[in-house]
Amino acid sequence: MRKFTIRTILALAATVAFSTASLAADVVLTPFGQSPDAMMIKVVLKKLQLEGRLEKLLQADGLQHEKVLITVVAGSSKGLGEAGIDKDAEIERMRSVVDAAKAKGMKVLVMHIGGKGRRGTLTDIFIDEAVPVADKLIVVEGGDFDGLFTKLSQQAGVDMLPAASVRETTEPLKQVLIEWGVL
């Protein structure tokens, strides 16, 4: 009887682990600009009961069987320095990752959650690169104070969903992930 109970518990644990692993395989998350903002979106994903894989320096060959690439755009000189790369290397990294994601049939969600405080020359360079390759865009309203996201998303034909704050990204993120068959 004891062997049966232990086997049952182990089988149940393996089933739960497999289920969690399959959920984790649906979303991969990476910063574009090396700011810490991607970590905040990982927390939002947890609120949606989704374990996204966060890879700060994700490379094209690091994509697995995910359905969605979420890239959180905000430039950080400190973050780039800690990663040992410059803005040009970061742009090349993201081009490579996005090209590989698109080739695998993945959806690309670009997010900017830092508001006006995360905008500046460096971030704007990354925004110019990111918006045209997005399938959808979620932007905290303060981040579009000058209409840059609106202009770029209209030029690229990308739907932009606003959020009042980082906390308020939960609903638009949920909406996008449902639409894309992840939730």
Regions found by a protein language model. Give the residues of each.
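Bacterial N-terminal signal peptides that target proteins for export
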Residues: 1-10
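Sec/Tat signal peptide C-region and signal peptidase I cleavage site
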Residues: 18-24
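Charged, low-complexity C-terminal accessory regions
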Residues: 24, 139-183
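Short, charged N-terminal beta->alpha structural module
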Residues: 24-48
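A short, well-structured beta->alpha microelement
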Residues: 45-65
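A short, gly/pro- and small-residue-rich
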Residues: 81-104, 153-160
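Short beta-strand/loop segments at the ligand-binding rim of alpha/beta enzyme cores
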Residues: 104-112
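Structural recognition of alpha->loop->beta junctions
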Residues: 119-151
